[in-house]
């Protein structure tokens, strides 16, 4: 039986350039899954585009590090904004877990309002759901809602986190990322998964057209390089040749 490869494009809703890049990678490439930032400046645009792509599985990209939250979070925000200080707070044991749980629920409900259905799965911006204090909240929430979630098993093992009851892939990698994006890198990451015997594997990606919002990101031009690789006909052929079928978290 074919192995399942989920190429998930993160950051749907970040900007129109990001959205159009994800749509391009779906229509002409190997992306069949994405995750939406419901507090993103272009999330309504993303929702409208998704209705033209019934084959694109759309999950929720839980956001605790960028923009404004949907609910009051005085314990986490600074001047009303979310930010990357969340890791320092995690190390200090000062995370407002009640606020985070409430925000997770608000973002989920906002997703349903925008997209007209529940997300295929849950992951997060900057992998905040893998912070040890936050992981159980998200895992229990996903299991309760009956949706899948992204699990970085290396982080899970290093922090001895209890495995979620929510469906997930056997493998996951964020290694298709950085300044040296290429088809060779993509296939190296995929071959490493096959060598581990994983029958289902998620590859994180960030394909985009660069616009003013994307240019503000520390990870900018590589998003365009990712788009070139992910829409390459030779990549699609190489994936099929290795015995993989492309899909989304609905195929688990």
UniProtKB/Swiss-Prot annotation:
Listed EC numbers: 3.5.1.105
A molecular function (GO) term: chitin disaccharide deacetylase activity
InterPro entries, per database record: COD_ChbG_bac (IPR022948), Glyco_hydro/deAcase_b/a-brl (IPR011330), YdjC-like (IPR006879)
Cofactor(s) required, per the database record: Mg(2+)
Residues reported to bind Mg(2+): 61, 125
GO cellular component: cytoplasm
Gene3D superfamilies (alphabetical): Glycoside hydrolase/deacetylase
Subcellular location: Cytoplasm
Record keyword Glycoprotein present: no
Keywords: Carbohydrate metabolism, Chitin degradation, Cytoplasm, Hydrolase, Magnesium, Metal-binding, Polysaccharide degradation
Pathway: Glycan degradation; chitin degradation
GO BP term, pick one: diacetylchitobiose catabolic process
The keyword Magnesium appears for this protein: yes
Catalytic activity: N,N'-diacetylchitobiose + H2O = N-acetyl-beta-D-glucosaminyl-(1->4)-D-glucosamine + acetate; diacetylchitobiose-6'-phosphate + H2O = N'-monoacetylchitobiose-6'-phosphate + acetate
Function, as annotated: Involved in the degradation of chitin. ChbG is essential for growth on the acetylated chitooligosaccharides chitobiose and chitotriose but is dispensable for growth on cellobiose and chitosan dimer, the deacetylated form of chitobiose. Deacetylation of chitobiose-6-P and chitotriose-6-P is necessary for both the activation of the chb promoter by the regulatory protein ChbR and the hydrolysis of phosphorylated beta-glucosides by the phospho-beta-glucosidase ChbF.
Assembly and oligomerization: Homodimer.
HAMAP family attached to this UniProt entry: COD (MF_01246)
Protein family per UniProt: Belongs to the YdjC deacetylase family. ChbG subfamily.
The protein, known as: Chitooligosaccharide deacetylase
Species annotation: Enterobacter sp. (strain 638)
Origin organism lineage: Bacteria, Pseudomonadati, Pseudomonadota, Gammaproteobacteria, Enterobacterales
């Amino acid at each position: 039986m074919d192995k399942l490869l989920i190429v998930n494009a993160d950051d749907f809703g970040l900007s129109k350039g990001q959205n159009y890049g994800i749509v391009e990678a779906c229509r002409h490439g190997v992306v069949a899954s994405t995750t939406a930032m419901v507090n993103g400046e272009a999330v309504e645009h993303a929702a409208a585009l998704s209705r033209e792509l019934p084959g694109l599985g759309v999950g929720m990209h839980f956001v605790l590090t960028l923009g404004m939250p949907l609910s009051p979070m005085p314990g986490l925000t600074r001047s009303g904004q979310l930010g990357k200080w969340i890791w320092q707070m995690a190390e200090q044991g000062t995370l407002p877990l009640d606020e985070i749980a409430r925000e997770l629920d608000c973002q989920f409900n906002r997703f349903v309002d925008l997209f007209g259905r529940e997300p295929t799965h849950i992951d997060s911006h900057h992998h905040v759901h893998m912070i040890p204090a936050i992981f159980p909240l998200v895992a229990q929430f996903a299991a309760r809602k009956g949706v899948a979630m992204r699990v970085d098993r290396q982080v899970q093992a290093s922090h001895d986190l209890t495995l979620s009851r929510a469906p997930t892939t056997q493998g996951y990698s964020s290694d298709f990322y950085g300044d040296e994006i290429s088809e060779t890198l993509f296939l190296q990451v995929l071959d490493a998964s096959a060598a581990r015997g994983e029958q289902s594997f998620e590859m994180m990606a960030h394909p985009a057209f660069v616009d003013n919002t994307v240019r503000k990101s520390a990870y900018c031009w590589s998003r365009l390089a990712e788009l070139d690789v992910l829409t390459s006909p030779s990549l699609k052929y190489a994936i099929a040749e290795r015995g993989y079928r492309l899909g989304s978290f609905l195929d688990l």
